Amino acid sequence: MIRQLYQLSYAVLLKIVMLVVIGVVMLGAIATPALADDYNKETLVNADFSGRVLTDSSFTKANLRSSNLSHADLRGVSFFGANLETANLEGANLTNATLDTARFTRANLTNAILEGAFAFNAKFEGAVIDGADFTDVLLRQDVQNQLCKVAQGTNPTTGRDTRETLMCP
């Protein structure tokens, strides 16, 4: 009798443990959404973000001088007030990014997509913009004129001419 009671208790305990294990596994299987990263005010000089998916991340006032962001997915990213001097953004997707007051001095924006980005007070002195797509980018008129002086090429992804996307005369 005691032996049967012991076996029954063991069987019930084993079932409870199995249910707990299955529950934990099921909870772990539920996909959690990717959270945007926060790099605000970080010093990221020479950092390598090439090819990374960083959608909706924030680099507000970050120092990304000489960093590699080539072919990165930067859609919706905030680079507000960021230092991107001499950064490599070749082939990066900056669609709908916030670039206001960012410094792209001597940055490589070859074949980058900046469609719909807000870049009103961004600085682009000496930037390479061959094949960059500036469709619907909000720029100051003097910056637009400056970029039109060096604009050339066609973006290989969107098929748009850089000069046309800047609405150059």
Regions found by a protein language model. Name each.
Residues 2-9, 14-169:
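Tandem repeat scaffolds
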